[in-house]
């Protein structure tokens, strides 16, 4: 199937009802029960933020970028994430998505908005994350903001769709080592909030 047709199908699907938390919770750090589900309930004063899944043609497939955060950022130090960050005053969340993507990894090309995924509240940082899905006609050139990003990885969508890469790995959370569900990609391990967002995206892609 040609890339443009694939993108068209994704755009159509993202305009329909989304699976939301039922998909996100599959990659939650702690098994989701009623108590944990309350932890993901959005409070009255969350910090709005936006992240970007930037799709582009890649080796007869479609790829997207993940980043490794530095150990000097305020939240989620050293973790694998999507480019994005907190909303500034007087900007829309869509504008936040584009601005943060440019600031973190230097993407400064015209992007086509494909759609949005379900928002996700992260209790650890009090962020309410709004994911935007974009498309670039070719692989965008990137320049890392070394204050926020230490590395960037290109992930083929076919890898995301491979159930074999979902594993449990030991991670330290608040001084305690626990096994967490993780996307064990070829070049990085993605867990936590970003994995929860990608879990919904994966379920959407599987049903195209």
Segments and roles (model prediction):
Residues 144-184:
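NUDIX/MutT-family hydrolases
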Residues 1-81, 85-139, 171, 176-208:
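N-terminal leader/linker segments that precede catalytic domains of diphosphate-processing enzymes
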């Amino acid at each position: 199937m040609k890339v443009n047709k694939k993108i068209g199908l994704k755009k159509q699907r993202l305009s329909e009802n989304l699976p939301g938390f039922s998909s996100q919770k599959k990659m939650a750090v702690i098994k989701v029960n009623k108590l944990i589900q309350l932890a993901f309930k959005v409070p009255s004063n969350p910090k709005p933020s936006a992240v970007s899944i930037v799709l582009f043609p890649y080796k007869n497939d479609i790829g997207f970028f993940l980043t490794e955060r530095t150990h000097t950022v305020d939240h989620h130090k050293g973790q694998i994430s999507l480019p994005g960050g907190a909303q500034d005053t007087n900007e829309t969340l869509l504008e936040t998505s584009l601005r943060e993507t440019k600031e973190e990894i230097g993407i400064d090309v015209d992007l086509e908005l494909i759609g949005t995924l379900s928002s996700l509240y992260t209790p650890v940082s009090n962020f309410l994350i709004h994911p935007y899905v974009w498309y670039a006609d070719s692989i965008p050139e990137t320049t890392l903001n070394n204050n926020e990003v230490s590395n960037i990885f290109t992930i083929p969508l076919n890898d995301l769709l491979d159930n074999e890469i979902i594993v449990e790995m030991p991670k330290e959370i608040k001084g305690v080592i626990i096994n967490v569900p993780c996307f064990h990609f070829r070049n990085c391990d993605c867990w936590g909030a970003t994995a929860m967002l990608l879990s919904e995206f994966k379920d959407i892609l599987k049903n195209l």
